[in-house]
Amino acid sequence: MSKQAVITMENGQEIKLELFDQDAPNTVANFEKLANSGFFDGIVFHRVIPGFVAQGGCPNGNGTGGPGYEIDCEINPNKHERGSLAMAHRGPNTGGSQFYIAYAPQPHLDGVHTVFGKVVSGMEHVDEFRGRDKMASIRVS
């Protein structure tokens, strides 16, 4: 069975995710380590572009930060569809902690960014994001 994650927002809303640990094992392991250590607690979705993506995971809150290391891309057959969870990066093999949830299919990102999960419930909460929406926590089990 795939790993599951829950993003609990500051307002109590939950976004439940299925993680693709068979297709992106190192990316999922990194996300799990960061999540369960509390790295994401209190971090905002700093980049919200309706019709494109909601991006979070930057400890600086502006898209410039990360965990202090980089991970390799794990390109796989999963596509960027509505609700896809993927790693943000500034070039190949430069991911770390920043991730995004796609609002709509983004075929131009397929084969470029690692898709490592999908929203299974709570996408309506992501649809309500307006920017600077704060995560209380992310936990992976």
What are these regions (language model features)?
Residues 1-141:
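Cyclophilin-like peptidyl-prolyl cis-trans isomerases
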